[in-house]
Each structure stands twice: as structure tokens, then as C-alpha cells.
């Protein structure tokens, strides 16, 4: 089930990037942490899906939050 959710999240991100003018921002500042490289998070998520491993719910949630933060920063929902 988590693999399906992960694929849907990644597909939604790809569609949002194609439809809107999202900048090439690939890292965001997370409170209490250094910059998070969202591209490496997505690569890790895709690798987990392709290898057939269970997708960590924490990784999925963090990736989704970071993708949403980039989309919000780019005013996609405005």
C-alpha cells in the first residue's frame, strides 16, 4: 500500500512541476536541520520502490512534506 502512495506522491509532484512554473530549487531549510536535498530524498524513495523494499513511512512523510514546501514556496497553490 505504501508503494502505491509513494508512486502517487511522485506522480503528483511531476505533474505539478510540468503544469506550473516551479523554480529549480532542490533543497529547503527545515527547522532544526541543515538544508535538506529533496532530490536525494526522491532518489532514495524511488530506489526503495524499484528494489521492492518496503517504503519507510517516515521517509515518505518527510519527502511529501518537503515537496509540498517547495510547491508552496513557488506559489503553486496561489
From Swiss-Prot:
Q: Which residues form a coiled coil?
A: none
List, in alphabetical order, the Gene Ontology terms for molecular function in this entry.
Answer: sterol binding
Q: Where is the signal peptide?
A: 1-24
Tell me where it mainly resides: secreted
Q: In which tissues is it expressed?
A: Expressed in the hypopharyngeal gland of adult worker bees peaking at 8 days post eclosion (at protein level). High level of apisimin-mRNA is found in the heads of both nurse and forager honey bees. Expressed in the brains of adult worker bees, peaking at 12 days post eclosion.
Q: Where in the cell is it found?
A: Secreted
Q: Which residues are glycosylated?
A: 54
Q: Which UniProt keywords apply?
A: Glycoprotein, Secreted, Signal
Question: Which GO CC annotations does the UniProt entry carry?
Answer: extracellular region
One record GO biological process: multicellular organism adhesion to substrate
| Functional note | Major component of royal jelly, a substance produced in the hypopharyngeal gland containing proteins, free amino acids, fatty acids, sugars and other nutrients, which is fed to developing larvae by worker nurse bees. All larvae are fed some royal jelly early in their development but it forms the principal source of nutrition for larvae destined to become queen bees. May play an important role in honey bee nutrition. However, its role could not only be associated with larval development, because high level of mRNA is found in both forager and nurse honey bees.
Describe, as the record does, how this protein assembles with itself and its partners: Occurs as monomer and a variety of oligomers. Component of the apisin heterooctamer complex consisting of 4 copies of MRJP1 and 4 copies of apisimin, associated with 8 molecules of 24-methylenecholesterol; apisimin forms a bridge connecting two MRJP1 dimers. At low pH multiple apisin octamers stack to form filaments that increase the viscosity of royal jelly; these filaments may be stabilized by bound fatty acid chains. The mandibular gland, where royal jelly is produced, has low pH conditions favouring filament formation, while the higher pH of the insect midgut favors filament disassembly.
> What protein am I looking at?
Apisimin
Instruction: Recite the lineage of the species.
Output: Eukaryota, Metazoa, Ecdysozoa, Arthropoda, Hexapoda
Amino acid at each position: 500500500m505504501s508503494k502505491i502512495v509513494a508512486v502517487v506522491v511522485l506522480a503528483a509532484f511531476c505533474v505539478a512541476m510540468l503544469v506550473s512554473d516551479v523554480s529549480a530549487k532542490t533543497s529547503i531549510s527545515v527547522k532544526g536541520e541543515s538544508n535538506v536535498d529533496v532530490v536525494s530524498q526522491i532518489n532514495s524513495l524511488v530506489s526503495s520502490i524499484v528494489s521492492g523494499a518496503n517504503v519507510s513511512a517516515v521517509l515518505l512523510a518527510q519527502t511529501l512534506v518537503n515537496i509540498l514546501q517547495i510547491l508552496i514556496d513557488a506559489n503553486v497553490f496561489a
